[in-house]
């Protein structure tokens, strides 16, 4: 399952593949989304050439709801270019601008301890600072621990400036399923080139068969 080498490189990729874990959890346990942790994002939205793709991460507690439509003025949203991060109540206030390579985002995945294959239980994601446009959420490290009968995987993202693509570099990776279409930007094309968003222009396509079947399209600057 080579696809999981990509899972945590970018937040959009994480949101897409989290849907597969949630579907697996529902099919195995009959349970829906886990309840959101305090201050965690409840959804991630990406606006791209196909419209808006939402990724619902967790259910808000009590009578609170998680907005899944593109709206910068709903009082529960942080907007960053073509991305929105949704919260059960208000988003973090007065976030400072991230410094280069500063910790910007932490993801926490809970699994049932000693399960094989691992049984996914819940997700939480926390924003620590405002990463400027032109910078990416980039994987820096991940840790694993066990506590109270649960395995916890924590993934750390830093705010890093996009590099310029080389001649043979992948500029975008596109994930497409029957329910979602997301683009993961890898680098910036030179000024006279563009990174295509049409899957038919891909130089390599991988078909992944899991609970959710989807294609991965690798794009190069043209």
Curated annotation (Swiss-Prot):
Protein name: U-scoloptoxin(11)-Sm5a
Organism: Scolopendra morsitans (Tanzanian blue ringleg centipede)
Membrane-spanning ranges: none
Family in the record: Belongs to the scoloptoxin-11 family.
Top-rank taxon: Eukaryota
GO terms assigned for molecular function: toxin activity
Modification after translation: Contains 8 disulfide bonds.
GO CC list: extracellular region
Keywords, in A-Z order: Disulfide bond, Secreted, Signal, Toxin
Compartments, record wording: Secreted
Primary location recorded for the protein, binned into one broad class: secreted
Expression sites by tissue: Expressed by the venom gland.
């Amino acid at each position: 399952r080579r696809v999981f080498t990509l899972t945590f490189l970018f937040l959009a990729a994480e949101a897409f593949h989290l849907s597969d874990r949630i579907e697996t959890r529902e099919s195995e346990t009959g349970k829906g989304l886990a309840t959101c942790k305090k201050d965690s994002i409840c959804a991630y939205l990406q606006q791209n050439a196909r419209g808006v793709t939402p990724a619902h991460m967790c259910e808000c507690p009590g009578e609170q709801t998680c907005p899944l439509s593109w709206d910068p003025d709903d009082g529960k949203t942080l907007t960053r270019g073509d991305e929105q991060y949704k919260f059960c109540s208000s988003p973090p206030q007065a976030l400072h601008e991230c410094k280069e390579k500063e910790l910007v985002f932490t993801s926490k995945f809970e699994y049932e301890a000693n399960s094989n294959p691992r049984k996914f239980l819940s997700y939480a994601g926390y924003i620590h600072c405002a990463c400027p446009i032109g910078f990416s959420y980039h994987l820096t490290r991940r840790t694993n621990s066990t506590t109270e009968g649960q395995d916890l995987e924590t993934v750390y993202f830093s705010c890093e400036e996009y590099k310029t693509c080389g001649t043979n570099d992948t500029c975008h990776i596109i994930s497409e399923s029957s329910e979602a279409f997301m683009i993961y930007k890898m680098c910036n094309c030179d000024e006279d080139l563009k990174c295509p968003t049409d899957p038919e222009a891909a130089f390599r396509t991988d078909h992944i068969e899991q609970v959710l079947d989807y294609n991965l399209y690798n794009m190069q600057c043209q």
